[in-house]
Amino acid sequence: MRDHVVIAPDKFRGSLTAADVAARVAAGLGDVPTLRIPVADGGDGTVDAVVACGFTRVEVEVTGPVGDPVRASYAARDGVAVVELAEASGLRRLPGGPAPLTATSYGTGELIAHAVRHGARKVVLGLGGSACTDGGAGMLQALGARLLDENGEELPPGGAALRRLATVDISAFSAGHAHGHEHEHGQAEGQADGHGHGHGHGHSGRGLADVEFVVASDVDNPLLGPHGAAAVYSPQKGAGPEDVAVLEAGLARLAAVAAHTHGAVGAVEHDGVVRAIGVAGRPGAGAAGGVGFAALAFLHAEISPGIEYLLGLLEFDRHVEGARLVITGEGALDEQSLRGKAPLGVAAAAAKHGVPVVAVCGRRSISDEELRSAGISQAYALTDLEPDVEKCMAEPGPLLERLAALIASDHLSPFAGRHDDANGGSA
């Protein structure tokens, strides 16, 4: 007999974390047995989601996208580290505004280095919300790579400097070094391991070649060209038309040098339009300003659809087995939601077990037919209760509880008055 309800939402951007959404929905369901599994698609909010499901938060002081120190977190459990690029190198880490030509992914590399030094055997890298278009150069430098110009000088931060790239030396990756200058802090969810402050160039005891890397991303853009990292995403990071051309040239140079010095990477052709083949042309290479390319080419990462991989990490299939209903959602259910974002991934996973799915959202702009084709039988929007979007953003919690009560009435009447056997727990 089907028993519990699985609550598996993504965040409501700018209002509530995924865990907060799940808690509000659970409260609105009353005595219905629930299991809360906050989810994410690999973008911002990924660390929060996996911490809510039992991973330990590790907080570290690292280098922000413009060089300022920032406190960023990753999540760890049983030799697996989940690193979210937006934590260290995201747009929200730009207090002085965009820096499209000079922003760096160095801090993300420092998070990875810290995780490896503290025992991570697998690193899941969530890409999304990045401030930089540096092709992952900063991340590689933080991990010990040397990116040199023709005079043997280390390149400064940022995508513009890549135009002068002559050599990429990753020999340190196999030498058991995990570089970094980060400083570790205590965490409310648990301490990392009691080693205190991690200054300088630490030693992981093994090379990065011994670490498995997975890129969790739903972005399918290549590195270069009209659908590449610079053309599509750098304008969102403050790049004007001239900046886009500079960044495209830098990424093309990175791909060319990588192809020349690391033959398996691929090659670049110039025939009026820059075309990348090999790794640079793979779907996802353009994710997060080209960090996807660096992970594929130099860390030998695998790319996995973000929501699918994270649902596996959180053992969603096991938790949804025997459920009466799954409630998913995100801030806006729109056309983007139909292209592989978290609610669709949750719906697809639930469908394998024959469990119906409904969604909560702040607002929606897709039809009932589109929802049903995506595996979601019904959607409940905050704007159904409060047409003022600003009020919905400011006070979403009580509205979510009211939506959950409607869901209980519409779909869960056999549970009326029953005791919450799952105790509102999290996965």
Model-identified regions with their sequence ranges:
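N-terminal loops that bind phosphate or other acidic moieties
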Residues: 1-185, 189-427
